[in-house]
A protein has these predicted regions:
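Short, basic/aromatic recognition patches
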Residues: 65-69
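Hydrophobic/aromatic beta-strand patches that form the interior of the parallel beta-sheet core
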Residues: 3-5, 22, 53
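A short, hydrophobic beta-strand/beta-hairpin element that forms part of a small beta-sheet core
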Residues: 78-85
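N-terminal "domain-start" segment that seeds a small globular fold
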Residues: 1-11
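Short loop/turn motifs at secondary-structure junctions and domain boundaries
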Residues: 71-74
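Local sequence-structure signature of Cys/Sec-based thiol-disulfide redox active-site neighborhoods
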Residues: 10-44
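Thiol-based oxidoreductase modules, predominantly thioredoxin-like and allied folds used
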Residues: 24, 48-64
Length: 85
């Protein structure tokens, strides 16, 4: 299982070697839980293709909002963001 990241800064994301897959998840949302479970079914393949960052949007809402702002995307949950180069 992937571990949750408590601190993330877009300027420190290194996506040169492989893309970074940011998964924003809420454990209070059944749709988010289903989405995370589907991603976990493909965990081995995803780990080969990308560096995976998992964010709990309930526990780390401020970081989740900051990340959305830095990347210029709307804050959603569930949400998958791919950062490449």
């Amino acid at each position: 299982m992937w571990s949750y990241t408590n601190d993330i800064d877009v300027s420190n994301i290194d996506s040169e070697a492989k893309p970074v897959l940011i998964i924003k998840h809420s454990n209070r949302c059944s749709i988010s839980s289903v989405a995370l479970n589907r991603l976990l079914e493909s965990q081995a393949e995803l780990d080969q293709r990308a560096r995976v960052i998992l964010i709990d949007v309930i526990a780390n809402r401020s970081n989740s909002l900051l990340l959305a702002s830095q990347l210029g995307v709307d804050h959603e949950s569930p949400q998958v963001i791919i950062v490449k180069n």
